[in-house]
Regions:
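N-terminal beta-strand motif that seeds the catalytic metal site of vicinal oxygen chelate
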Residues: 1-16, 67, 125-126
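Active-site beta-strand termini and strand-to-loop segments that position acidic
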Residues: 40-45, 111-114, 124
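A short acidic/small-residue loop/turn micro-motif
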Residues: 100-101, 124-126
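Long, continuous compositionally biased terminal/linker segments
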Residues: 42-79, 85
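Core segments of cupin and vicinal oxygen chelate
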Residues: 7-48
Length: 126
C-alpha cells in the first residue's frame, strides 16, 4: 500500500548522519540526495526520506511529512487526486503527472487531507 514515508528535518546533515547509521545497521544503503536536498533511503520494499519542508516553514511532526500510497497505473494516480479533491482534499505542489525522482521516473499526485496531512499517490513505471 505505501510507497514511501517522508519526515521533516531542520538539520539535514545531522539527520543524514543519524539515518545513515541507524538504517545502515539494518542493512540499508546510505541515503542519496535528490535535487531538492532531501535524503532518500530505498529498499526493494519501499523508501524513506528526510528533508526540509518544501514550504520553507520549520519542520515538525506534520510539516515536512508525506505519506505515499502505491498506485498500479498512472490513471490511478489521477483518480486518487480527483477523488480526494472532490471529497474535501486540497491539491498541492505541482499538478498530477510524471516526474523524475532520484531512482528513476515516476507519476505523482499530492493532496492535503481535510486535517492538513500531506499524502500522495505514486506510480513507478516498469
Amino acid at each position: 500500500m505505501f510507497t514511501h514515508v517522508t519526515v521533516g528535518s531542520n538539520d539535514i546533515e545531522a539527520s543524514r548522519k543519524f539515518y545513515d547509521a541507524a538504517l545502515g545497521a539494518l542493512g540499508v544503503d546510505p541515503g542519496q540526495p535528490d535535487a531538492k536536498g532531501r535524503i532518500w533511503y530505498r529498499t526493494a520494499r519501499g523508501a524513506f526520506a528526510v528533508g526540509t519542508p518544501l514550504d520553507g516553514e520549520a519542520a515538525s511532526c506534520a510539516n515536512g511529512g508525506t505519506i505515499g500510497f502505491a498506485a498500479r497505473t498512472p490513471e490511478m494516480v489521477q483518480a486518487f487526486h480527483d477523488a480526494g479533491a472532490a471529497a474535501g482534499g486540497v491539491s498541492i505542489e505541482d499538478p498530477p503527472g510524471p516526474r523524475q525522482g532520484p531512482f528513476g521516473p515516476l507519476v505523482l499526485a499530492y493532496l492535503r487531507d481535510p486535517s492538513g496531512n500531506k499524502i500522495c499517490a505514486l506510480h513507478r513505471p516498469a
